[in-house]
From Swiss-Prot:
Knockout consequences: Able to assemble functional PSII, however electron flow is deregulated; forward flow from Q(A) to plastoquinone is slower while reduction of the oxygen evolving complex is faster, loss of light-activated, redox-dependent phosphorylation of LCHII, plants senesce quickly. Plants are hypersensitive to light, cannot grow photoautotrophically and have drastically reduced oxygen-evolving capacity. Dramatic reduction in PSI subunits, almost complete loss of PsbP, a subunit of the oxygen-evolving complex.
Subcellular location: Plastid, Chloroplast thylakoid membrane
Membrane topology: Single-pass membrane protein
Name of the protein described by the UniProt record: Photosystem II reaction center protein J
Any one GO CC term of the record: photosystem II reaction center
Family matches, as Gene3D superfamilies: 6.10.250.2070
Family: Belongs to the PsbJ family.
Subunit text: PSII is composed of 1 copy each of membrane proteins PsbA, PsbB, PsbC, PsbD, PsbE, PsbF, PsbH, PsbI, PsbJ, PsbK, PsbL, PsbM, PsbT, PsbX, PsbY, PsbZ, Psb30/Ycf12, at least 3 peripheral proteins of the oxygen-evolving complex and a large number of cofactors. It forms dimeric complexes.
PANTHER family, per the entry: PHOTOSYSTEM II REACTION CENTER PROTEIN J (PTHR34812:SF3)
Alphabetized InterPro entries for the sequence: PSII_PsbJ, PSII_PsbJ_sf
Keyword Transcription included in the entry's annotation: no
Entry keywords, A to Z: Chloroplast, Membrane, Photosynthesis, Photosystem II, Plastid, Reaction center, Thylakoid, Transmembrane, Transmembrane helix
Amino acid sequence: MADTTGRIPLWIIGTVAGILVIGLIGIFFYGSYSGLGSSL
């Protein structure tokens, strides 16, 4: 597992993807709760 030079490690991709998904879900629920996300 030493040839990860030049590529992004898979765990970084998974972590970033998880944060983005959680952020998008949080924004969606917050927007729909406050009445601003009805256009989404």
